[in-house]
């Protein structure tokens, strides 16, 4: 398992929130919590950018992926609208999570509620090379559903 030290800056509205952290020793994602003054009610099909109260300085060559928490998704239909959301290494603003309620009931988000998880990943930079032909494969140009449902 690789280790990476990343600086986090606490913003004023983070208040008493702890730094993002791993819930277990085997967790791949750090839990992100809501840094809000008042509860936010997400009605069905509504989406909202929820602040976390922290900014960070990822080193070059890394990204952060914002992903849903499985319990919120399964139990309430609360998920990350642009999953996985991407935070680039040169971004220094507040981490926010775009939550969407795909369930049938209102869902209330409160200060300190764990709303998403953040996974750190290495980035590979691709150099696009224009070509007239592509290597043949068994799948060829078979698209959606071409390998079975």
Predicted regions and their residues:
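DUTPase catalytic domain/fold
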Residues: 1-149
């Amino acid at each position: 398992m690789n280790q990476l030290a990343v600086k986090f800056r606490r913003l004023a509205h983070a208040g008493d929130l702890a730094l993002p952290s791993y819930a277990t020793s085997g967790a791949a994602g750090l839990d992100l919590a809501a840094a809000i003054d008042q509860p936010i009610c997400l009605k069905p099909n509504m989406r909202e950018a929820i602040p976390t109260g922290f900014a960070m300085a990822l080193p070059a060559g890394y990204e952060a992926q914002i992903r849903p928490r499985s319990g919120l998704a399964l139990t309430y239909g609360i998920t990350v609208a642009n999953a996985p959301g991407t935070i680039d290494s040169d971004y220094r603003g507040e981490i926010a999570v775009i939550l969407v309620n795909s369930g049938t009931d209102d869902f209330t988000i409160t200060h300190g509620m764990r709303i998403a998880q953040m996974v750190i990943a290495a980035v590979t930079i691709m150099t696009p090379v224009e070509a007239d032909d592509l290597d043949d494969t068994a799948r060829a140009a078979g698209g959606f559903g071409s390998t079975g449902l």
